[in-house]
Amino acid sequence: MAISKEKKNEIIKQFATHEGDTGSTQVQVAVLTADINELNEHLREHKHDYHSQRGLMKKIGHRRNLLAYLRRTDLPAYRELIKALGLRR
């Protein structure tokens, strides 16, 4: 259910703001989005996996808070990230 290290490293390289960047808001949101998409696929097959549903809700809430922070602090980066990830905002 979790994303692989290789996929996570690809996402980090794509959204990093500088070399060695693993913790910027953009990277965190991108990794959470990939995790959320993986969990959605899992839950389509396993509808009654309530523990995973709870984890999905927690990840969505975390992403929502990070996006609100990014929107407050750096609006152009927020808009660029939303467009790159294909989120509906």
From Swiss-Prot:
Q: Which SUPFAM superfamilies match?
A: S15/NS1 RNA-binding domain (SSF47060)
Q: Which domain of life is it from?
A: Bacteria
Cross-referenced InterPro entries:
Ribosomal_uS15, Ribosomal_uS15_bac-type, uS15_NS1_RNA-bd_sf
Biological processes per GO annotation: translation
Family annotation (PROSITE patterns): RIBOSOMAL_S15
> Per the record's keyword annotation, is Thylakoid included, yes or no?
no
Q: Name one Pfam family in it.
A: Ribosomal_S15
Q: Which GO terms describe its cellular component?
A: cytosolic small ribosomal subunit
Keyword rRNA-binding in record: yes
Q: Which UniProt keywords apply?
A: Ribonucleoprotein, Ribosomal protein, RNA-binding, rRNA-binding
Give any GO molecular function from the UniProt entry. structural constituent of ribosome
**UniProt-listed NCBIfam families:** S15_bact
Task of the protein = One of the primary rRNA binding proteins, it binds directly to 16S rRNA where it helps nucleate assembly of the platform of the 30S subunit by binding and bridging several RNA helices of the 16S rRNA. Forms an intersubunit bridge (bridge B4) with the 23S rRNA of the 50S subunit in the ribosome.
On assembly, the entry states:
Part of the 30S ribosomal subunit. Forms a bridge to the 50S subunit in the 70S ribosome, contacting the 23S rRNA.
Family that this chain belongs to: Belongs to the universal ribosomal protein uS15 family.
Any idea what this protein is called?
Small ribosomal subunit protein uS15
Q: Which organism is it from?
A: Limosilactobacillus fermentum (strain NBRC 3956 / LMG 18251) (Lactobacillus fermentum)
Tell me the name of the encoding gene. rpsO
